């Protein structure tokens, strides 16, 4: 099955002009009858299918680069240094008609083009907790569009208006999914300290860092650290994450940040925005692999020039 909406766009972490640093957006339209609480009820099959689409895209992308067919013409989802994956925006779209109860002055409006998130429309599928950049961590969101606006837009057959709407809604998908991630995770940048072997530190601590680190650009000298956020625990509860899990993971995250301080300049927490900014730091180190010092089997001995206790 072909999904209804799939396109290549800006990654959720950082903007880029290079195709290899973009990501895939995967969307499917669900124009079902709405419930009394004005929500579209999705079946389990629809949800699992949407996760399967994302997994298939990830594996297809992996095969391109494993087979040597990437050639910079496709997004490269996996970062080879950290083995983290660029998060894939995955979403449903449903149609709504502005009503008197929830739309106020926009009742039956043909001009309301706002993309709205459905209440309780966020779902999270994962194999491990607190690993945003793991390939099996898949976020799924659900949005509404004004059915009357869409009918009006395509009924007029105005190509420029349709192109403007497409550009607007694609940016909105990115902004809104970024907003959801900001509720779930705390983001920090890591820049290597001068004189420290940061590459080896990542290798030695791979188990602790797996799924938490990502290098958004292949030649960048910084990493992104994403850790589960404790403050907005209500959204975690809506995702059926136990409070004991939140406490355990956030406690381990604090220990991890302390450990990273020995080799990296760790920034203050920041939120994902349209543009990405990084602090300017003097005398930063490098993330490249350092040559190992050669160890030779040398035996060193001492011979006294004189020995006061020795007599002929």
Region locations from a protein language model:
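Catalytic core segments in nucleotide and nucleic-acid processing enzymes
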Residues: 1-273, 279-291, 295, 304
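Short, low-complexity, charge-dense intrinsically disordered segments
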Residues: 307-312
């Amino acid at each position: 099955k072909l999904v209804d909406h799939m396109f290549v766009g800006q990654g959720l972490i950082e903007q880029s002009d290079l195709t290899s640093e973009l990501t895939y957006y995967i969307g499917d339209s669900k124009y079902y009858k709405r419930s009394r609480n004005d929500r579209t009820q999705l079946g389990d099959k629809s949800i699992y299918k949407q996760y399967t689409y994302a997994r298939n895209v990830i594996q297809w992308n992996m095969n391109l680069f494993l087979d040597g067919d990437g050639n910079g013409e496709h997004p490269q989802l996996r970062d080879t240094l950290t083995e983290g994956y660029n998060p894939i925006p995955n979403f449903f779209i449903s149609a709504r008609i502005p009503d008197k109860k929830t739309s106020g002055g926009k009742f039956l409006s043909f001009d309301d083009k706002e993309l709205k998130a459905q209440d309780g429309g966020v779902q999270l599928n994962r194999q491990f907790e607190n690993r945003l950049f793991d390939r099996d961590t898949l976020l799924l969101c659900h949005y509404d569009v004004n059915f009357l606006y869409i009918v009006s837009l395509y009924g007029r057959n105005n190509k420029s208006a349709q192109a403007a709407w497409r550009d607007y809604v694609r940016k909105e998908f990115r902004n809104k999914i970024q907003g959801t991630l900001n509720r779930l995770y705390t983001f920090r940048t890591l820049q290597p300290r001068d004189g420290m072997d940061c590459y080896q530190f990542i290798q030695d601590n791979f188990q602790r860092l797996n799924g938490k680190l990502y290098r958004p650009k292949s030649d960048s000298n910084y990493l992104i650290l994403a850790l589960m956020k404790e403050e907005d625990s209500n959204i975690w509860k809506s995702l059926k994450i136990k409070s004991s899990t939140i406490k355990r993971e956030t406690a381990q995250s604090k220990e991890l940040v302390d450990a990273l301080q020995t080799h990296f300049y760790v920034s203050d927490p920041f939120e994902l925005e349209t543009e990405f900014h990084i602090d300017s730091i003097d005398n930063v180190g490098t993330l490249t692999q350092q040559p190992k010092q050669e160890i030779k089997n040398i035996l060193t001995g001492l011979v006294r020039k004189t020995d006061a206790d020795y007599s002929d």
